[in-house]
Every structure is written in C-alpha cells, then in structure tokens.
Amino acid sequence: MDWMPPPKPTSPRSPPLLWDWADAAVPGSSSGEVSAAAAAAAAHPGRRRKEKRGRAEEGGGGGGEVRCQVEGCGVELVGVKDYHRKHRVCEAHSKFPRVVVAGQERRFCQQCSRFHALSEFDQKKRSCRRRLYDHNARRRKPQTDVFSYASARPPSSLLFDDNRQISFVWNKAPLSHVRPFAISPWESSSEVGTTDGHIYLDKSHISKSLPAFNTDIDELLPMKDFSAATIWMFFGVLFIRTAQESCMSFH
C-alpha cells in the first residue's frame, strides 16, 4: 500500500470587504432615514454644536435656570433682556459701583460686558479705564484745516473773493515789515502818465509805496490788465488798515 501525504489544511474563507449598511440599520428605522441623517450631519458639521450650545444656555449651562452670578443675589433671569441673560447679571447689579463675585469685589464694565477689579475704574465710572481711553481717542478729530503758507506764488483766490472784490489777506504781515507811503502818488504829476485813458506810474515810485514783500508785484497780481488807480486804491486801503492796527497796539 502506497503512502500518501495528508492533504493541506485550507484557510477559512475571508469575509467580504464591502459592508452592507442596510444590514446594520438601527431596528425600527429604514436605511433611507439613516442615510439622510448622515448626509445632513456631514453637510452641516457646526449645526449640532450650535444646537447643543443653545440648549446649554437655555438650561443654564447643563441644568437649572440662569441666575445672576453676584453673591447674595441669585435672581432667576427669566423674561429679561438677552444681554443680561448672556452675561449672567441682573440689570440692577450691572449698574452697581461695587459687587462681590466669586469672593472678590468687582464692578461690571459696560464696554467690556464683564466684571473687572475696582482698581481698573476711575472713581464711579461704569466703564474701565482702558476702554474709556480708546473711546476718547476715537472721538478726537485731527486738525486738517491748517493752511500752509509755503507756496511761493499764492492763488488768485487769496487776493480776490468770489465777487472779484479785493481781499485783505495780505494784511497779515508784521507791522515792522510794512513801510508807509513815502510820497503820496498824487503829489507829483511828473511821475504819472496817461495813455488811452489808463494811468501808468513809475515803477520806482511804486516800489517805495508797497509793503516789503519778498515777491514781485507781477507775481502778487495775477491779472495783468489792472489799472494803476485800482492798484493804488488797494494799497491805500491796506495802508489805512495797517495804521489802524498800529494805533490799536499803542492803547
């Protein structure tokens, strides 16, 4: 009788890799309801957290009603504003200058919406010092209306207003820089000439009567067709105004 080796043991059949979710459904619920709930949870992962947070706030943090956290109060915050309910403080104690919270003296800050130590407040202020400083800094307006006099040639709007009347903005120079009229332009007719009905004065005579500006007369007057009478009228009024200010300074 011939010898034969024993047959090799066969490995058990491996289970299928795919899981049938329909077979593992919760008893009493269909597979469609389970798949719909799973899809909704995957699409909105933060909805369940918000629902839990809302239930915790309604129940006072996991049990009981929301009450004021000030020691000796314990008022149930029902039918009050959401602001006081959220920060767990009744309306009366939110305005108290001194309360006791967790065994320490505190004051409720209206800006921070939480309790601070009394040393962080100024006198009986209901907002802490840091928040008041930030609030006042925002209310300060920067001074942007400062005029700059650095331009060499001033615009014509400084010399004439909207009605084309002569302005007195050039009377801002110190009195020591303004020279009075040395000789009246109407005393000597030799320096005055007329052509086509316009009056022309000697330029050297004009330079003696003008204030000591660093700018030439052609740069001061933007309009070249001004008559000499208009120029003398302007500087005559300017001289009178300067004399009035000189008299006022002596009183």
UniProtKB/Swiss-Prot annotation:
Does the keyword DNA-binding belong to this entry?
A: yes
* Keyword entries, A-Z: DNA-binding, Metal-binding, Nucleus, Transcription, Transcription regulation, Zinc, Zinc-finger
Q: Does the keyword Nucleus apply?
A: yes
- Where is Zn(2+) 1 bound in this sequence? 68, 73, 90, 93
Reported tissue expression: Expressed in stems, leaf sheaths, and young panicles.
Pfam families cross-referenced by the UniProt entry: SBP
Identify the PROSITE patterns for this entry.
ZF_SBP (PS51141)
Gene Ontology cellular-component terms listed: nucleus
Q: Give any GO molecular function from the UniProt entry.
A: zinc ion binding
Ranges where the record places region Disordered: 1-64
Membrane-spanning residues: none
- Which conditions up-regulate this protein? Negatively regulated by microRNAs miR156b and miR156h.
Give the Low complexity compositional bias ranges.
Answer: 24-43
What does it do? Trans-acting factor that binds specifically to the consensus nucleotide sequence 5'-TNCGTACAA-3'. May be involved in panicle development.
Protein name, UniProt field: Squamosa promoter-binding-like protein 4
The taxonomy runs:
Eukaryota, Viridiplantae, Streptophyta, Embryophyta, Tracheophyta
Q: Which gene encodes it?
A: SPL4
